[in-house]
Amino acid sequence: MNINQTSQRAVVNWQSFDVGANAQVNFNQPNAQAVTLNRVTGASASQIDGAIRANGQVIIVNSNGVSFGKGAQVDAAAVVATTMNFSNQDFMDFKHVYQGNGTGKVVNEGRITAHDPKGFIALLAPEVRNEGYLVARANVANTIAMVAGEKITLNFQNNQLMGVRVDVSTINALVENKRLVFVDGGTVIVAANSARQLMNGVVRNSGVIVASSAVNNGGKIDLIAADVTNTGKLLANGKGTGTTGGQINVAGENITLAASSKIAANGDAGGGQINVGSKAAVSNNEPAITAKNVRVESTAVVSASAINSGNGGTVKIHSTEQTQIHGVISANGGAVSGNGGVVQTSSNGTLVVGSTSQVNVAATNGQSGTWKLQAGQLNIDRNM
């Protein structure tokens, strides 16, 4: 099926919107900034098992839910799938304000690609799950957002998605990634509920979230919820010659970096910045968050090191009640030149440094870095 659009913005109301396994829907739009808002008014969720192609941007709104099956292939300049209402007036006024209490979920098991240099992918609902592939690798301006809440605002500047604002709500919000989210040096935002009121929000990552780049510096990854559990990988590495690591923020009340967790913001010419539980400025432009409890389990890895040259980066792990360090934390200087970085492990309450913990701020051809320990009560179960 071909949908031909001649205007920059168009609204299509559907009784149902589904794409079968062998079907393809083509949106033929004037340019990459043209947008089609597809609003489903019927009582059933949208099931996308086939292909959607667009040279512009595609928005699917269905309060009953939007599911992309394992065979789904979506390729557009930008993609939004949501169960929240998006009014015609806001759409025409270029205001991306999504709100409402739709009970449906947004689930991706297929492949969604944003191919434009300023392209983005946004999955917005009370419950968002990615079990497939979300890819936006055209430019460092790309952003992928998986956000759960009752009112969500996407903030743009010069047609680029710059951040997300989630208003306070009381719903049980869940965002989960089980497969792959990939931006090439861009930004990934994974948030459940507002940073102002983190209650009832859960983020779980057992997959791989990548904001690394082979050409540019590492990008930015934000995980924000009341309860954040990472058993997978968060990677914002600068892999190319002369590049530096990016920034990774894990913000919430209760944070667990499980034994299989790997968080890395390494760079060829300098380490990046990793904040776990510490007061960090996150991408949703909301107040800084400090965790109550942070646990870094045995064999978990947190690294902001320089690889070849340059200084190690900064790793900050902080809580107000208890911080437990049992894993491996590194902010090493480059192998050829550069100094070690800074690791700060702290708590207003209790800081536990377990027997399996390792903290590395070494420099082969420079000065060693600094490991700062700050706590109301310090418990050390290892040789220092």
Question: What do these predicted ranges mean?
Answer:
Residues 1-384:
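Extracellular and secretory-pathway beta-repeat/beta-biased strand scaffolds
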